Design a protein with these regions (language model features):
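Short S/T/G/P-rich N-terminal loop/turn motif that feeds into the first structured element of a domain
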Residues: 1-203
Length: 203
């Protein structure tokens, strides 16, 4: 769920102290991402829930109506959009400092794009970078998300992301690299940097 929070820290603290919000919908993990750059509006942040299947995620939608949230919670936020996202490649829940890019990829190139993202992730890790690349397809995302994919480049810290980008821009890019293949198949729509954290775990 994408929201505009009056005070992102206060909002995060409030929902973190109320685990029943996540237990009631069957989340296995939950957290927040606060947008640091590329904001579309003040207080931009993303509240995420992880489920063990799309089935569980869809069932979770039926168990929570944002319009019926406690008054204190409602007063702390304005809801912008919500969606279900399906990961298209292996992705471990390990939030951190994240570059989030929404892209368009032609449907016939989807499998090749996911393979290129996997290749890029493997190449980056082989070069010593602590990075994970997630590719997500939206389900019921409205006009903002329809026809796009969300790509998340996840690293533990701003320093590690910055160092990785410094190294990247000072290196020659092979046309056979995973990055080059991804770029050739995608058209960027939006690009932000988010600071993410996990605030709930079912286990």
């Amino acid at each position: 769920m994408n929201i505009s929070a009056k005070n992102p820290k206060a909002y995060t603290d409030y929902i973190a102290s109320n685990p029943a919000l996540f237990e009631s919908i069957g989340s296995i993990a939950a957290g927040v991402c606060v947008t640091q750059t590329g904001q579309d509006y003040p207080g931009q942040m993303f509240v995420w829930n992880a489920f063990d299947s799309v089935k569980s995620a869809m069932e979770g939608l039926t168990k929570y109506d944002p319009a019926m949230a406690p008054k204190k919670l409602s007063a702390m936020r304005d809801i912008k959009t919500s969606a279900v996202w399906k990961p298209l490649k292996k992705f471990d829940v390990a939030p951190g400092y994240e570059r989030v890019t929404r892209v368009m990829v032609r449907p016939g190139r989807l499998s090749a794009f996911v393979a290129a993202a996997t290749q890029m992730e493997n190449e980056a890790q082989a070069a010593g970078l602590n990075v994970q690349i997630g590719v997500f397809a939206p389900i019921g995302g409205g006009r903002e998300e329809t026809g796009t994919l969300t790509v998340r480049f996840v690293q533990p810290s701003a320093s590690e992301m910055g160092q990785g980008l410094d190294n990247f821009f000072s290196s020659e890019i092979s046309p056979e690299s995973g990055f080059a293949k991804m770029i050739s198949m995608m058209r960027p729509i939006n690009d932000t940097i988010e600071v993410c954290q996990q605030i709930y775990s079912a286990s």
